Swiss-Prot record:
The keyword Cell membrane does not apply. This is Restriction of telomere capping protein 5. The keyword Cytoplasm applies. Residues 157-172 have a biased composition (Basic and acidic residues). It comes from Arthroderma benhamiae (strain ATCC MYA-4681 / CBS 112371) (Trichophyton mentagrophytes). It is found in: Cytoplasm. The lineage of its organism: Eukaryota, Fungi, Dikarya, Ascomycota, Pezizomycotina. One of its GO terms (cellular component) is cytoplasm. Residues 355-583 form the TLDc domain. Belongs to the RTC5 family.
Length: 660
C-alpha cells in the first residue's frame, strides 16, 4: 500500500495531494487488516463512478450504501434527511490533513480510507491526542461559515461509468474555517515536519501543517438545522451493529417513535443553546458539551462506516478455509455476527412494559452513560436492562419499592417522570430526571460503606435531567472521601429516597423522619409516598462538597466560570418511577465486586436476575418457616410474647435477622 514511498521520498517537492495519498496508504496499512482492505476495495470499486482514471463516490452512492435517508420526505420536514450532512462531513474528512487546501475532497478510495479511520475510532494508532483532535475535526466537518461549494454534478453529465465530479486543486481556497489566520507565523520547515510525520506515522504533526494557527476555527459555527438532522440520525441508529442493515431502523419508524426521537433531539439541543440559535453552535460550546455531557454521541458513526469493511460479494467461509487471508479470532467473531439476523433487544424478556424507557431514551442514555470498561457505550458493550420496579406496575409504595429494588444486587438506572410545579401557576412542563447507581442499593439498617473505583467512569454514579432540557452531573472523583452522612443513595420508609443528599442524624423523637437536604452540585429527593420529588442542580458554589460534580453544560465552561452561586430547585409531581437493572452479558476484564457476591441464600448464581429470584424464594421460605413456628408457639398473649422473645434471641426475627 505504498509503504516504501515514505522513508526515502523527499517531502520538499511533494504536493498536498501526493502527501495526502501517502498518508492514506499509511492509514490503510496501519489501521486495517488485509481482509478488511479486501472487503473495502470490493465495496468501493463495485459502486464507484468513473471519470477518466478517477474512481469516486458521490452523495447518492454513499447514502444508498449506508442506508440513510437522502432527500426523503417520508419522515417529514427533512428532519431525517441526513444524507447531505454525512456527505459534507466525509468530503471534509477525506481531505485530512490538508483541509485548508483540499477540502471539499472527492471521495476517492484514498479519501474513503481516511474517512473510515477517523470515524471508526481507528485513529488511535496515528492521532496521538486522540479525542480532542477528533472533536475538532468533527466540528470542522459540520461548520457552515466559510464553507465553499463543491462544483455540482449536473444530471446531463451522469452515466453509469462517467459522471462529472467536483474539481479540487491545491491552489484553490478550501474551507476558510481552516485557513491560518496569521501567515506571518509560517515556518520554512513545514515540509520537513510533514516528511518526519509521514516517516513516524505521527499524524498530528501532519495535521498541524494545515492547521498552524487556526484561530478562525473558533469563529465558525454549526447551524442548529444541520446538527438537528445529524442528531436525529444518531438517535434512530444508536443500537446499530456493524453488519445490520441501517435501512431497517428507518423502516420500523412510526409516528410515535418519530415524535419521541424529535423530542429527544430537541432536549439534547438545549445543552448547546446558550443564546440566539440563529448564530449556531461555536467551537467552544461544541467541544465542552461533547467532551463533558455527550462523550459517546458520535459512536454510531463507527458501526455505520464499518459497513464498508463487510462485502456481500465475498465468500468469507471460502477465504477462511483456503487460508488466503490471516483472520484473527476477533475477526472470526465479527464474521459470525455478520450472518446473524439481528442483535438481541437491550430490554430483557419478562420485564414490565415501560412507561418512560423507550428507544429514544435508551439512545439518549447511550450518548453519555458509561456502564462498563473498556467499552463504555451501553448499546455496544453487551449491556441488557431488566425491569426491577415500576410504580405503574408494582404500585406507588415504598414497601413494594423495597421488595423489588433492595433485592437487586447489581447496578441500576432510576428514571422519574412528572410535571414541574411552577410557582407562577404556568402550564406544567413534563420533566424526566434520573440517576445511574453503579452499586446495589443498601438496606436502611446497613452500616457498611461503599467503595467506588474512581479509575473507571462506569463505577461512578450519574445524576441527570433528560427533559425538557438536558444536563448531566457525574460522580465526584473524591466520592470515597465523603463523610458517611453523604451517601450516594439513601432509602428510608419515613424520609423517602435520597440521591446525593446530606442525611441528618436521627433524633430521639423520630429515628429517621428528618428530611435529607441538598448537597454538592446535584441531588434528587423523592417523598415516602412516591408522589413528589425535588431535583436540585447547582454550579457547585451554592452547596458544600457532595456526591456529584457541576453539570457539564455550556454556560459553565472553563472559559466562562461561574462568578456567583447559581442553584435551581425543581419541584416535581411524579407520574411514574422506573428502576432498570443493568446486566452485563459480555465478559469484562475485571469483574466488579457485586458480581461475586454469594451467600447461603442464593449460592453461586450467574446473573443478577436469577440471584434476585433466588433471594425472593429464600424470603418466601423464611416467611413460611416463621409462620409455622408462630403457630406452634400457642395462641395466648403471654405465650405469644414468650414465643416472640425466643425467636428474637434465635435471630430469626427482629434487627438481628435483618443484618444476617
Amino acid at each position: 500500500m505504498g509503504a516504501g514511498q515514505s522513508t526515502n521520498t523527499s517531502g520538499h517537492g511533494a504536493s498536498p495531494e501526493e502527501m495526502s495519498r501517502i498518508l492514506a496508504h499509511r492509514f490503510a496499512s496501519k489501521c486495517f487488516t488485509p481482509l478488511e482492505l479486501t472487503h473495502l476495495k470490493d465495496n468501493f470499486y463495485s459502486l464507484a463512478l468513473k471519470q477518466g482514471d478517477i474512481h469516486y463516490w458521490n452523495e447518492e452512492v454513499l447514502s444508498r450504501f449506508l442506508g440513510i435517508p437522502d432527500g426523503d420526505e417520508k419522515f417529514g420536514l427533512g428532519t431525517l434527511d441526513a444524507g447531505p450532512v454525512i456527505f459534507r462531513m466525509v468530503s471534509y474528512l477525506g481531505a485530512f490533513p490538508f483541509q485548508n487546501t483540499l477540502a471539499p475532497s472527492v471521495l476517492t478510495f484514498d479519501a474513503m480510507v481516511k474517512v473510515i479511520v477517523l470515524l471508526t475510532d481507528r485513529y488511535g494508532k496515528v492521532l496521538r491526542r486522540g479525542k480532542k483532535d477528533r472533536i475538532k475535526l468533527l466540528f470542522g466537518s459540520l461548520a457552515d461559515i466559510g464553507r465553499k461549494e463543491a462544483s455540482p454534478i449536473t444530471s446531463g453529465d451522469k452515466s453509469d461509468n462517467d459522471q462529472g465530479r467536483p474539481k479540487t486543486r491545491s491552489d484553490e481556497a478550501g474551507f476558510s474555517v481552516d485557513k491560518p489566520s496569521n501567515d506571518a507565523d509560517d515556518y520554512n520547515d513545514d515540509d520537513d515536519l510533514v516528511l518526519a510525520a509521514l516517516e513516524s506515522l505521527d499524524a498530528i504533526e501532519v495535521f498541524k501543517h494545515d492547521q498552524r494557527i487556526d484561530r478562525t476555527a473558533y469563529e465558525a459555527h454549526i447551524s442548529f438545522d444541520t446538527f438537528q438532522r445529524l442528531l436525529m440520525l444518531f438517535v434512530v441508529i444508536a443500537p446499530l451493529q456493524s453488519c445490520e442493515k441501517t435501512s431497517e431502523y428507518f423502516s420500523q419508524l412510526n409516528e410515535e417513535s418519530l415524535k419521541s426521537a424529535r423530542y429527544c433531539v430537541e432536549n439534547i439541543l438545549t445543552s448547546f443553546d446558550i443564546g440566539d440559535r440563529t448564530k449556531g453552535i461555536d467551537y467552544e460550546t461544541f467541544y465542552w458539551v461533547i467532551s463533558t455531557s455527550l462523550p459517546y454521541m458520535f459512536d454510531p458513526l463507527t458501526p455505520l462506516f464499518e459497513h464498508l469493511l463487510f462485502s456481500k460479494n465475498l465468500d468469507l467461509s471460502r477465504r477462511k478455509d483456503s487460508g488466503t487471508c490471516s483472520v484473527s479470532e476477533e475477526k472470526q467473531k465479527k464474521t459470525e455476527f455478520c450472518i446473524s439476523p439481528s442483535h438481541p433487544p437491550i430490554i430483557l424478556p419478562g420485564s414490565f412494559k415501560p412507561c418512560i424507557l423507550d428507544s429514544a431514551v435508551i439512545s439518549h442514555l447511550s450518548f453519555f452513560l458509561s456502564t462498563s470498561f473498556p467499552t463504555p457505550n451501553l448499546l455496544q458493550n453487551g449491556t441488557r436492562l431488566h425491569g426491577v420496579f415500576s410504580s405503574d406496575t408494582h404500585g406507588e409504595s415504598l414497601t413494594s419499592f423495597s421488595h423489588n429494588v433492595l433485592t437487586w444486587d447489581a447496578p441500576s438506572i432510576l428514571l422519574v417522570t412528572g410535571s414541574i410545579n411552577h410557582s407562577s401557576g404556568d402550564e406544567a412542563d413534563i420533566i424526566t430526571v434520573g440517576a445511574y447507581i453503579p452499586q446495589p442499593w443498601k438496606l436502611p439498617a446497613s452500616t457498611s460503606t461503599s467503595h467506588y473505583d474512581t479509575s473507571h467512569q462506569s463505577q461512578l454514579p450519574y445524576l441527570f435531567q433528560l427533559s425538557p432540557r438536558y444536563a448531566v452531573m457525574q460522580g465526584s472523583p473524591s466520592i470515597n472521601s465523603l463523610k458517611p452522612n453523604l451517601p450516594v443513595v439513601s432509602f428510608s420508609t419515613k424520609s423517602g429516597i435520597a440521591i446525593g443528599c446530606k442525611i441528618p442524624p436521627p433524633t430521639r423523637t423520630s429515628m429517621d423522619s428528618s428530611r435529607p437536604t441538598p448537597a454538592g452540585s446535584g441531588s434528587l429527593w423523592i417523598d415516602p409516598a412516591l408522589e413528589n420529588a425535588e431535583f436540585v442542580m447547582s454550579n457547585g458554589l451554592s452547596h458544600e462538597e457532595g456526591v456529584f460534580l457541576p453539570p457539564g453544560i455550556a454556560r459553565w465552561s472553563p472559559s466562562r466560570p461561574p462568578s456567583k452561586a447559581e442553584s435551581e430547585t425543581i419541584k416535581i409531581s411524579i407520574y411514574n418511577i422506573e428502576v432498570w437493572g443493568v446486566v452485563q452479558t459480555a465478559p469484562t476484564p475485571a469483574q466488579s465486586p457485586y458480581h461475586s457476591r454469594t451467600s447461603t441464600a442464593n449460592g453461586d448464581i450467574p446473573d443478577a436476575v436469577a440471584r434476585q429470584q433466588a433471594n425472593w424464594n429464600f424470603e418466601a421460605r423464611e416467611a413460611e418457616r416463621r409462620r409455622e413456628i408462630h403457630l406452634n408457639v400457642g395462641g395466648g398473649d403471654s405465650e405469644e410474647q414468650t414465643g416472640r422473645a425466643l425467636l428474637e434471641m434465635a435471630g430469626i426475627i427482629g434487627d438481628s435477622a435483618r443484618r444476617r
